[in-house]
């Protein structure tokens, strides 16, 4: 996982959760990298307007962000070759806004078989020794038909609030 210093705090937090999901599936925790560092394959993620890496890839003609630019909570998956020096192939998850990037990261978890309910009722994924994602995963998400979608619990502080604080540090994704 290419960890960009400029990434939004909530996006960084979710990237960490997705790394845990990958570890649940493979038994191996993906390394975080801050440069190419000789990595054969990598996951790069960023939010338009908050990611110099996305800007550089787009300027070099390696990444097309026009399909998601300006679209509420949209993200794209693009597998590209040699995105950065030292990285052979990368899955680039780009979001138009913070939630778009977060939904894109969680889409990766779904692709490898992790249920969104893994934290709620311990729905553990099937073990896989390897996970292969190729250009068949290239896609652009649709604009959601409902803005501000989410799971809202208004009066359950005792149970849900304490659970959220234990697992996420607070009730807000930051």
Regions found by a protein language model. Name each.
Residues 1-3, 21, 32, 45, ...:
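Functionally constrained cores in energy, signaling, and assembly domains
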Residues 1-11, 38-49, 151-152:
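Short hydrophobic beta-strand segments
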Residues 29, 33, 116-119:
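Secondary-structure transition/capping residues
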Residues 32-67:
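Short, well-ordered secondary-structure micro-motifs within conserved domains or adaptor modules
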């Amino acid at each position: 996982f290419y960890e960009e210093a400029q990434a939004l705090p909530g996006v960084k937090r979710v990237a960490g959760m997705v790394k845990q999901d990958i570890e649940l599936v493979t038994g191996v925790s993906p390394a975080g990298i801050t440069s190419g560092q000789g990595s054969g394959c990598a996951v790069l993620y960023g939010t338009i307007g908050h990611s110099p890496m996305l800007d550089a890839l787009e300027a070099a003609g390696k990444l097309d962000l026009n399909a998601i630019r300006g679209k509420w909570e949209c993200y794209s998956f693009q597998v590209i070759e040699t995105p950065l020096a030292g990285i052979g192939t990368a899955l680039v998850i780009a979001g138009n806004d913070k939630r778009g990037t977060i939904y894109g990261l969680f889409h990766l978890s779904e692709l490898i078989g992790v249920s969104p309910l893994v934290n709620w009722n311990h729905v553990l994924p099937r073990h896989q020794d390897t996970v292969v994602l190729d250009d068949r995963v290239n896609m652009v998400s649709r604009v959601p038909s409902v803005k501000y979608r989410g799971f809202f619990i208004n009066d359950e502080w005792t149970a849900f609030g304490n659970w959220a604080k234990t697992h996420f540090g607070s009730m807000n994704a930051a």
